[in-house]
């Protein structure tokens, strides 16, 4: 599943081709995604793009009369291609935005768990309501994590993945951040000390920022907007490495199920 770095990589990749230009029209080949593609998107015509933003794992395309909200789901990706390639769409290419600069923004999603929604005012969007702070913002810090963790019996790993606590820390980056901070994922969140909370917040920021710089993590379906894979997978310390030696101490990496999601950790390096 594309996580925050992959979505931010997509945002940065498509922004130069959209902002300052207009969407001439949309081509929707399959409207049956996680939710049906909004009717307002189907009827877009000559709409200037004012900005391309991100909130959590949602891409927000600002137009003069509203917003397109895009979620990549489990396997979605966005890429830019030239308009002459419009007829080369495959069976998993569900949505195109045709831009007035000769480019097309194409949405590909083999599993069709993504979403293309319309909203006139982001403040009224149900999918954006009740989200926690952005992990790369100043609002997310050690003091915040420590206060939120008090008396929490939830295991640290699934706790970090709760979008009401902090957005965008998905399965990959929760495992990687906990390893970098030396914290076992199966401890209760309430066991965090102030020092550990400060280190964990700092580590989450560093891991996410590094992944963004590397273009995200390509595990199955994710590609950058230029069609190239992300390279952070080459730097993964624990995720997906069960049974392999820890890159730090050589102890075999272990895996466990937390909240029905696979968690990876080093029993020696993490406490």
UniProtKB/Swiss-Prot annotation:
Catalysed reaction equations from the record: Hydrolysis of DNA containing ring-opened 7-methylguanine residues, releasing 2,6-diamino-4-hydroxy-5-(N-methyl)formamidopyrimidine; 2'-deoxyribonucleotide-(2'-deoxyribose 5'-phosphate)-2'-deoxyribonucleotide-DNA = a 3'-end 2'-deoxyribonucleotide-(2,3-dehydro-2,3-deoxyribose 5'-phosphate)-DNA + a 5'-end 5'-phospho-2'-deoxyribonucleoside-DNA + H(+)
Alphabetical keyword list: DNA damage, DNA repair, DNA-binding, Glycosidase, Hydrolase, Lyase, Metal-binding, Multifunctional enzyme, Zinc, Zinc-finger
GO biological-process terms attached to the record: base-excision repair
CDD domains reported in the protein's UniProt record: EcFpg-like_N (cd08966)
Cofactor names: Zn(2+)
InterPro entries the record matches: DNA_glyclase/AP_lyase_DNA-bd, DNA_glyclase_Znf_dom_DNA_BS, Formamido-pyr_DNA_Glyclase, FPG_cat, MutM-like_N-ter, Ribosomal_uS13-like_H2TH, Znf_DNA_glyclase/AP_lyase, Znf_FPG/IleRS
Zinc finger map (FPG-type): 237-271
Enzyme Commission number, as recorded: 3.2.2.23, 4.2.99.18
Cofactor info, note text: Binds 1 zinc ion per subunit.
One annotated GO molecular function: damaged DNA binding
Pfam families per record: Fapy_DNA_glyco, H2TH, zf-FPG_IleRS
Family matches, as Gene3D superfamilies: 1.10.8.50, MutM-like, N-terminal (3.20.190.10)
Amino acids binding DNA: 92, 111, 152
Residues the record marks as active site: 2-3, 57, 261
Annotated SMART domains: Fapy_DNA_glyco, H2TH
Function: Involved in base excision repair of DNA damaged by oxidation or by mutagenic agents. Acts as a DNA glycosylase that recognizes and removes damaged bases. Has a preference for oxidized purines, such as 7,8-dihydro-8-oxoguanine (8-oxoG). Has AP (apurinic/apyrimidinic) lyase activity and introduces nicks in the DNA strand. Cleaves the DNA backbone by beta-delta elimination to generate a single-strand break at the site of the removed base with both 3'- and 5'-phosphates.
Similarity field: Belongs to the FPG family.
PANTHER family: FORMAMIDOPYRIMIDINE-DNA GLYCOSYLASE (PTHR22993:SF9)
Complex formation: Monomer.
The protein's name: Formamidopyrimidine-DNA glycosylase
């Amino acid at each position: 599943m594309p996580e925050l770095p992959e979505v931010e990589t997509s945002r940065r990749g498509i922004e130069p081709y959209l902002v300052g230009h207009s969407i001439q029209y949309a081509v929707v080949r399959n409207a049956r995604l996680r939710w049906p593609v909004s009717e307002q998107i189907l009827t877009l015509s000559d709409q200037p793009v004012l900005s391309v933003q991100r909130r959590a794992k949602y891409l927000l395309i600002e137009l003069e009369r509203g917003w397109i909200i895009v979620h990549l789901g489990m396997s979605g990706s966005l890429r830019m291609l030239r308009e002459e390639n419009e007829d080369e769409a495959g069976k998993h290419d569900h949505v195109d935005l045709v831009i007035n600069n000769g480019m097309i923004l194409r949405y590909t999603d083999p599993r069709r768990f993504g979403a293309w929604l319309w909203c006139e005012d982001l403040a009224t969007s149900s999918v954006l309501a009740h989200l926690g702070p952005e992990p790369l913002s100043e609002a997310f810090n050690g003091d915040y994590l420590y206060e939120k963790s008090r008396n929490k019996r939830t295991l640290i790993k699934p706790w970090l993945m709760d979008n009401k606590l902090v957005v965008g820390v998905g399965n990959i980056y929760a495992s990687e951040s906990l390893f970098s901070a030396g914290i076992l994922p199966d401890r209760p969140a309430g066991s965090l000390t102030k020092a550990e909370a400060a280190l964990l917040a700092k580590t989450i920021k560093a891991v996410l920022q590094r992944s963004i710089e590397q273009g995200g993590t390509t595990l199955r379906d994710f590609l950058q907007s230029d069609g190239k894979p992300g390279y952070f997978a080459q730097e993964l310390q624990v995720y997906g490495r069960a049974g392999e030696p820890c890159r730090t101490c050589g102890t075999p990496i272990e895996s466990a199920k937390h909240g029905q999601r696979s968690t990876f950790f080093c029993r020696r390096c993490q406490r």
